[in-house]
Amino acid sequence: MSRVGKLPITIPKGVDVSLDEPLLTIKGPKGTLARRMPGDVEVHLEQGAVLIRRKDESNKSRSLHGLVRALVNNMVHGVSEGFVISLEIQGTGYRADAQNNVLNLSLGYSHPIQFVLPEGIKGAVDRNTIRLEGIDKELLGQTAARIRALRPAEPYKGKGIRYAGEHIHRKVGKTGSKK
């Protein structure tokens, strides 16, 4: 039995869960999320909780048990409270600016980069910090990873984009030649 999968997911007030096999729809104050459930697990709605159970003991259903529970839990958390990821920009001349759903990034290249945020993700810039908000944790994490990939922090001077609180392993540079 999966230690994660067997735990019930409590549904907070203001969140509505509906199951139309195989589509699970969760509505809350922040928005609506829907996801197709795999056929190897069963979703049960019981008095203020969602339970995920395996159909059989096959390797596939055992591996999906905890995954599906975590995905549904993230959906419930997203529509009730939402998720936030912060990115930090470090480097001389590196700047960011947010206009509507477009991030204008100046990252030391010969041209500015215009990054269009996907629907459902909001971005704000405060000095050298990019704050991304959304209800879909998967889409939010993928968007943050794509922004970070534009100029990842390099190990010598630490310039680039990093997650807030991320530790960059620093390296020492070359030493001068000995004559």
Curated annotation (Swiss-Prot):
Single GO molecular function: structural constituent of ribosome
One BP term from GO: cytoplasmic translation
SUPFAM superfamilies (alphabetical): Ribosomal protein L6 (SSF56053)
One Gene Ontology term, aspect cellular component: cytosolic large ribosomal subunit
Domain of life: Bacteria
InterPro entries: Ribosomal_uL6-like (IPR000702), Ribosomal_uL6-like_a/b-dom_sf (IPR036789), Ribosomal_uL6_a/b-dom (IPR020040), Ribosomal_uL6_bac-type (IPR019906)
Keywords tagged on the record: Ribonucleoprotein, Ribosomal protein, RNA-binding, rRNA-binding
Role according to the record: This protein binds to the 23S rRNA, and is important in its secondary structure. It is located near the subunit interface in the base of the L7/L12 stalk, and near the tRNA binding site of the peptidyltransferase center.
Family: Belongs to the universal ribosomal protein uL6 family.
PANTHER family linked to this entry: 60S/50S RIBOSOMAL PROTEIN L6/L9 (PTHR11655), LARGE RIBOSOMAL SUBUNIT PROTEIN UL6M (PTHR11655:SF14)
The protein's assembly and partners: Part of the 50S ribosomal subunit.
Protein name: Large ribosomal subunit protein uL6
Source organism of the structure: Syntrophobacter fumaroxidans (strain DSM 10017 / MPOB)
Taxonomic lineage of the native organism: Bacteria, Pseudomonadati, Thermodesulfobacteriota, Syntrophobacteria, Syntrophobacterales
